Amino acid sequence: MALSISIYFLLIFLSHFPSSHAEPFIGVNYGQVADNLPPPSETVKLLQSTSIQKVRLYGADPAIIKALAGTGVGIVIGAANGDVPSLASDPNAATQWINSNVLPFYPASKIMLITVGNEILMSNDPNLVNQLLPAMQNVQKALEAVSLGGKIKVSTVNSMTVLGSSDPPSSGSFAAGYQTGLKGILQFLSDTGSPFAINPYPFFAYQSDPRPETLAFCLFEPNAGRVDSKTGIKYTNMFDAQVDAVHSALKSMGFEKVEIVVAETGWASRGDANEVGASVDNAKAYNGNLIAHLRSMVGTPLMPGKPVDTYIFALYDENLKPGPSSERAFGLFKTDLSMVYDVGLAKSSSSSQTPSGKVTSSGWCVPKKGATNEELQASLDWACGHGIDCGAIQPGGACFEPNNVVSHAAYAMNMYFQKSPKQPTDCDFSKTATVTSQNPSYNNCVYPGGGGGGGGGGGGSKAVMNKYVSSDKVEKKNGATEPKVSSSLSFLLIFLSLIFHVYM
């Protein structure tokens, strides 16, 4: 019995170790306002060829939910705005909704969240707004009645217009007209451990302020940044600023601990003549840099160290959506399953390895002394979003440790430099980088480059200690550098040793 308990706690402990391939924070919206979509079975094959771990549906299409069974892909299903009145007024309607849309598929299909309505608070329909919370409560009770209350969460989705103030991010607050309705909803989310779902779109922020510096800020590209006048924090991208504004708004109402989920964000690859910024290049830059930013695990300035679960809009272009041309051009993939543009979502067997490190240049590109973490994070996001394989600095990769911005930026900057024509501007990164003759490789983390007398980065060369590895991460051993065993791993080894001595 004691051994079983020990193993149980060991499994819990091990579950907190990251997988080298799992990216549970990256999802995609699977819209269906189209008449040319591939069958669900083909879409599932497409998803399985990527690192996408979650899918958000706007409804509860049984064919899609069933097709996702056994894949491990997390699923968000939705009750439509038109369902809200009956769900609010009749608990039996909520029970029937769960019986029809959840029970036939769960747990084979990994349903995680039910969104009740989409942007209802902004609908200007007071009756619908008043019915939203009762509808959510009845859906929650229906889940609890079948013992799924703690396994499937219930929320609703909001647009950024729910905020009355968002600049600076630390002053974020909900619009006065929404606060009364939100108070009960936020209490419900807090009580049930459910997330606050929001739709931030830097794409629309740029359209309202189409300056070059705004575009760079929205696309995660190197820029001067924007300083929060209250906190002194410099923001280098619009996404973080918008998400932190939502966090501040939640905090202002006493719900700081309610988790934020980005239910939608994306960038149009084409648009009408008056839709500034809608292009393939900008869409690739935004989504690619966003994914790189999430993979960096840096979080946001007000929520550091934790990537926000984010659903990119959208999986496919939807040719029947009304409105301007951009509404039909947010897809990552065409309906023939080919990519509209590549943002690095395809699975790669080499994601946990470093390149061979052949001598390709006379030097390595590394951060300049004095560059700030904010500047380096922007450079890291930009490099990884422009065709660089940053798998080595993701969890499980050979260069993931030390897990800090400086080390990860050094690797990404150098990878970009080695793939470029190696002009001085290719190792500039807004004046935050420089070329060095000192090989920054360490242990099994190989930085391609070198040449001349500097010593290549190949496996047979003796790499000098990477000065971007912080002193608390390394110690010298026989002239080489070795990573210290992390406290978590030390605990694990001690734990296993105790089990061995007690039970063997």
From Swiss-Prot:
Gene3D superfamilies named among the record's database cross-references: 1.20.58.1040, Glycosidases
Record bears the keyword Transit peptide: no
EC code(s) of this entry: 3.2.1.39
Keywords: Cell wall, Cell wall biogenesis/degradation, Disulfide bond, Glycosidase, Hydrolase, Secreted, Signal
PTM statement from Swiss-Prot or TrEMBL: Contains two additional disulfide bonds.
Residues the record marks as active site: E119 (proton donor), E264 (nucleophile)
Record-linked SMART domains: X8 (SM00768)
Name of the featured protein: Glucan endo-1,3-beta-glucosidase 7
